[in-house]
Amino acid sequence: MLDKKARIRTSREYRNVFEKGKRLSGRFLIIYYVENALDNNRFGFITNKKIGMAVIRNRIKRQLRAIVREYQGQVKNKHDIVLVARAGIGKSSFEGMEKDYIAIMKKAGLFARNANKID
C-alpha cells in the first residue's frame, strides 16, 4: 500500500489535477499529472463501472498500485498523478498494464533522467 502522504485523497485534490494538469492516454490508461508544492509524488487511481463489477475494478486498482510502487523511486518528485483505467483494461494482463504505464510515463517525461534502464 502507498503511504498516506503518497496518495491523492480528497475530491478537491483530484479536481485540481484534472483542471490544471496535463493528460496523456495509452491503450489501457489515461494519466493526468500536475506539479505540486510538496517534496514527494502523490498518486490517485480511478476505475469506473464501464470496466466491470467491483471485484474486477478492485483487482485493477490493486494491480495499478503494485505497478506504481515498483516504479515509484524512478518518477520525478513533486507531481500529483492520477491513473484512470480505460474500459479495455479488464481483459489485459498485468504485463500489458505495466508496459502501458511505462510508455505513458516516458512520454510525459515523468521518469527521472538517472532512473535505471526501463524497458
Swiss-Prot record:
It is an enzyme of class 3 (hydrolase). It catalyses: Endonucleolytic cleavage of RNA, removing 5'-extranucleotides from tRNA precursor. The keyword Nuclease applies. GO terms for cellular component: ribonuclease P complex. Coiled coil: none annotated. SUPFAM superfamilies: Ribosomal protein S5 domain 2-like (SSF54211). It comes from the Bacteria. Its EC number is 3.1.26.5. The keyword Metal-binding does not apply. GO terms for molecular function: 3'-tRNA processing endoribonuclease activity; ribonuclease P activity; tRNA binding. One of its GO terms (biological process) is tRNA 5'-leader removal. Keywords: Endonuclease, Hydrolase, Nuclease, RNA-binding, tRNA processing. It holds the Pfam family Ribonuclease_P. RNaseP catalyzes the removal of the 5'-leader sequence from pre-tRNA to produce the mature 5'-terminus. It can also cleave other RNA substrates such as 4.5S RNA. The protein component plays an auxiliary but essential role in vivo by binding to the 5'-leader sequence and broadening the substrate specificity of the ribozyme. Consists of a catalytic RNA component (M1 or rnpB) and a protein subunit. Belongs to the RnpA family. This is Ribonuclease P protein component. It comes from Syntrophomonas wolfei subsp. wolfei (strain DSM 2245B / Goettingen).
